């Protein structure tokens, strides 16, 4: 496996400065965002699609630093029932096209989350037993059978036509696919191009064990994010882990995304990566730095040091 980096946490730096910072840390593989939830600070999707000269300049900036692009990331909500969904679907289609033009074989996404019915206007995340109230069962059936699976069947065909080999869905909250079981429900319906972007931080705060999850996923692991989470023991013991406070208020949250090694110790990370590799994954581990208790640069350095000690080469 190889250390990569999601460049958004250095979004305050211009493209070339970001590349130089990453190169000094020994990172030579990048994952870059194209839009969706991200402002795409280092990549202009429409510009690169429309101009072969701009694509050449972009590629040369990477090549002169001996860097490669391992994946494009268009995470958003393509299943939103309103204008947001329309915009994110357009960005997704364009990302597939740009991946084809750049020779990038992997696209990182989120599954999306539909509304609860054809007349609803906002997404609806069902995470409680469908036994009560009974309408929850109808909502989930609508979301999966009427919205998600038909969309994803079309998107897989689009990706195939563009030369994309893998779509990796992040197991993120407020998405229809948020764990291995929901990933397999979609994968079984649309095919093996769709796999998981295994982000252990989300599984941990949801109460799962990412190491055991990796065993269950096997060849369905299409990508890995190196991101840690810390359960804040005092607040989580009082209120549990269901949390709606802003991420910008870490002192008052029950859990927080933190630099790698500031939540789980290095022995945990060694075992996690060892099992991921044992299950056949040989790809990139993209550092995603979202620790708001320190500067982006400090968090990246802390995480890179931890990941270099623990990734199974």
Swiss-Prot record:
Pfam families: AP_endonuc_2. Coiled coil: none annotated. SUPFAM superfamilies: Xylose isomerase-like (SSF51658). InterPro entries: IolE/XylAMocC-like, Xyl_isomerase-like_sf, Xyl_isomerase-like_TIM-brl. PANTHER family: HYDROXYPYRUVATE ISOMERASE, XYLOSE ISOMERASE-LIKE TIM BARREL DOMAIN-CONTAINING PROTEIN. This is Uncharacterized protein YfiH. It comes from Bacillus subtilis (strain 168).
């Amino acid at each position: 496996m190889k250390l990569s980096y999601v460049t958004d946490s250095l979004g305050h730096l211009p493209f070339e400065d970001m590349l130089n910072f990453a190169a000094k840390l020994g990172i030579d593989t990048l994952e870059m965002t194209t839009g969706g939830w991200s402002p795409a600070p280092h990549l202009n999707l429409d510009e690169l699609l429309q101009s072969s000269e701009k694509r050449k300049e972009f590629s040369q900036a990477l090549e002169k630093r001996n860097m490669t692009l391992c994946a494009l990331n268009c995470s958003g909500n393509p299943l939103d029932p309103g204008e947001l969904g329309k915009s994110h679907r357009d960005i997704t289609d364009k990302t597939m096209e740009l991946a084809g033009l750049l020779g990038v074989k992997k696209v990182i996404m989120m599954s999306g989350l539909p509304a609860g019915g054809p007349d609803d206007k906002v997404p609806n995340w069902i995470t409680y037993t469908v036994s009560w109230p009974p309408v929850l069962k109808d909502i989930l059936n609508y979301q999966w059978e009427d919205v998600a699976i038909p969309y994803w069947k079309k998107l897989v065909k689009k990706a195939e036509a563009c030369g994309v080999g893998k779509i990796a869905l992040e197991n993120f909250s407020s998405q229809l696919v948020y764990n291995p079981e929901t990933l397999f429900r979609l994968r079984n319906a649309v095919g093996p191009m769709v796999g998981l972007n295994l982000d252990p931080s989300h599984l941990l705060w949801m109460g799962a064990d990412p190491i055991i999850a990796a065993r269950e996923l096997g060849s369905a692991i299409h990508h890995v994010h190196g991101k840690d989470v810390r359960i804040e023991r005092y607040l989580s013991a009082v209120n549990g882990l269901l949390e709606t406070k802003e991420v910008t208020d870490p002192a008052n949250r029950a859990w927080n995304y933190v630099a790698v090694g500031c939540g789980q110790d290095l022995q945990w990370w060694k075992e996690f990566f060892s099992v991921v590799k044992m299950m056949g994954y040989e790809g990139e581990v993209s550092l995603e730095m979202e620790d708001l208790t320190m500067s982006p640069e400090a968090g990246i350095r802390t995480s890179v040091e931890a990941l270099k000690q623990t990734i199974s080469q």
